[in-house]
Amino acid sequence: MTIQILSPQLANQIAAGEVVERPASVIKELVENSLDAGATRVDIEIDKGGSKLIKIQDNGSGIPKSELNLALSRHATSKLSTLDDLDAILSFGFRGEALASISSVSRLTLTSRTAEQTEAWQAYAEGSDMAVKVIPAAHPVGTTIEAVDLFFNTPARRRFLKSDKTEFTHIDEWLKRIALVKPEIHFTLKHNGKQVRNYRPANNQDQYLMRLAQICGKNFAEQAIEIDCQHEGLTLSGYIQSPFFTSPASDTQFFYVNGRLIRDRLVNHAVRQAFSEHGTGELASYVLMLEIAPHQVDVNVHPAKHEVRFHQSRYVHDYILQALQSALMQVARASISLPEEKLVEFVEDDWHSKPLSTGRVSEADPSNYATQSKFDEKPRESGSQGQSSSISAPSSYSRGGEYSARSQPELPSASEIASYTQLLKTPQTAQASKLVNSDLKTPMPPVLAGQYWVYAGDELSLLPIDIVAKWLVKRDILAKIDNGLVSQPLLMPVSIKVDEDWLNTIDEREQLLRQLGIEITIRLGQLIIKKVPPYLRQSQLVTVIPELLQWVRFEEPTHEALALWLAKQDDGKFESAVATWSAFSQLDDEIQQELAQKAKVLPWQSWLEEQLSD
């Protein structure tokens, strides 16, 4: 076949494959256009999950008659005109592909009127027909777009659509996300003629908290801590869960950059690292908005604009991490240091806080960042919360409501120290260890307290055995997961109250669950767990299984990620230090060194010398 230029119709349909994945994608593009046009109200109406009808009406600035035809052309946009504009994007749209792509896979009608026009005009385009018909119409100032029969001319794409309920769920989820970052906009959503969502404009904090409760749940809104931190062109605001929140949920995790919801590993790592000090980690709940100079972030990474790249990624990571750590620690410390009746107002180190009843944490002291230049790539070396520095362990509440300090690893007793010192001074002990393990490929180091291998070199160090054991479990899972893990029936099936979102997730991920060795059914409003792989038998299934379903609901995790997750859930202790060392010593030297670096190595030489000198 000879090389040739694609026809505009075919090019648009190919582009639609990137931009228009499902009805929710169409609504995302059209609503973002409404917001860029300055709309203060956006009404969304869909039929049959959006596959039959998608209708978006706004009160924005509208489109002049002379530009209606051009608006449906590919690479036509009002958002930018020069290369410099691409480096300073603050609008949602800028690629000029959405309307052309949508019109190529649906029957699209665009009706609009500007404030300067006395009448409205309507443009109609259908599928591969590039001709646009423009006729007079009746319409208030603003724009209405109707997309009917989505994918009517691409049957293969239409077959890949899920059930109406599933497609509606994706639309509803996206609307929640945009409603959180655009509180001043009035959003409504109708499905099959019935209004299902009505997010009224929130013009003050109390009204925003009502919207937050409507979307994220009343429990989160009541205990959330408000963040408002500014420094050197960066502003982090929003709400995070209290360190004492007992019901964190991974489905309440929203992060926005310049008003755009994004998925970014760097951001996720910073947030999870901050919350990991309080035991929540990946389950932490938050709604955070980062404002940054547009030339410091590249949003032109993905056609759907879900991803961004920061020009100074390390600086942004450390800024987010330190802001969240300071806020969480401030609340935890205040709960300890002040009597209950004085918890109404307090001032703590770097942060100035408003009354705890509002859960607000306000602007950070700029002196915390004084030693670091703007957008410096190097990790912070000063300040109390830098990535490379250590912080005090935050506090938490026990289930009984009383304060208890975060548990710390127990230090060896005096007798253990004496035994350990004697071990180091007596060569016969090491020789005995070699005799016991003479059948191993490499002699096993001495074992301390049944938990650590003792390495002697320039500096004594302890390698936790359970970390190596977990890695070996992960490797074992990876070797078996392709053919499916073995299921083990539970003696007594576990039942959980079902969430309606799980129905579609279980249906869509049935093969994945079977591959993991998990057998679950839904009966009488209960999720019944019948079989699980051996790695989950000792886990809290009422927590673990919902966590897994929430994870796979929007993602397709790799086998590597699934194996790591299962290994972390395996609460079984390693069989023995000798058996673990035997498996460890069979690995390649390269892998052994990599494991030793990843494991937590504890320097004990100086600590022991101090203890013995006392």
From Swiss-Prot:
Compositional bias annotation for Low complexity: 382-401
Keyword annotations: DNA damage, DNA repair
Gene Ontology MF: a single term: ATP hydrolysis activity
PANTHER family per UniProt: DNA MISMATCH REPAIR PROTEIN MLH, PMS, MUTL, DNA MISMATCH REPAIR PROTEIN MLH1
Stored NCBIfam families: mutl (TIGR00585), PRK00095.1-1 (NF000948)
HAMAP family assigned to the protein according to its UniProt record, in alphabetical order: DNA_mis_repair (MF_00149)
Similarity section: Belongs to the DNA mismatch repair MutL/HexB family.
Protein name stated in the entry: DNA mismatch repair protein MutL
Species annotation: Shewanella woodyi (strain ATCC 51908 / MS32)
